[in-house]
């Protein structure tokens, strides 16, 4: 697979779980809002039992629907890799291997989706149903005791969920990670494993004795010294085992192609590899800060993630009638305009497919534009996203942002 093909597969794997996450966040936010409006303890206990029962059913239905979607997506991703790697007349062993990888990945993804966790208002990560109950209890308790007003209590109960999304627990480290990133990482790792298996089969069938690592611009620092190089079998295996990120795994855009040493000439000259390195190091300057080309790509991804988080927050705000809705709508337009400005300045294409959130359509986008236009100047101050300051923008920059076209997520 090429770096471009890997990037496309990675985007598809990341987007796969978005509908489930966004649907559940909206559902939970709506129920927390109702819980906060109840002041009688007995009435709340009745509502709590009913809401948790309905919520559990909603979670099960959303996850079940998502599993069906995910299994179709996973099958299509593995078919894509096989189609790019196998000729029609290949024997059935590699095709059977592709089917086995597909089944294994579908099974693991089902496990991940059935083990959802979320942040509670107290800052702890709990199983989703428990976190759901904690959020409702928090909103009710704070309002009933007069500790917080209704809007503040609901905002504090819902914000951790909207900000951090649905999560899963890594078995090795015990850390919680976003479910969409956990699924993407696992799927891409399995796709990489399948590609490795196919390449090794080609290696043996052709009588090869070495490997050549592909090369691309804007390379990560840990792989830049080795890209474009040829290695004997033993040398390559030793090198790959020494890497924290093996070739073709963990968001690596490289591939290792089988070669016959001394027969297959390198695909890249030393001058071409040096130009990749020099261009990356020279990088770009934006707002007085120098980025390598690789760092610019990472910054672009951080802003894209920030935009998705703000959109989720807006959807939760709408369900809970949060008075901060306008503030978040303004923030969205500021960050969207900054995204367009950053990409144009550093020479990167905007990636609208990475900004999509299920349920956030044209109406939400238009309301965000209107809120921005009505905002007083003091509301258009600088904002921070993902730990980075983004600067307020002008009407000209807002007009430069392409009109959102996304109205939903297709299951096709």
Q: Can you annotate each of these PLM segments?
A:
Residues 1-154, 271-412:
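N-terminal leader/targeting and assembly helices and adjacent pre-domain segments
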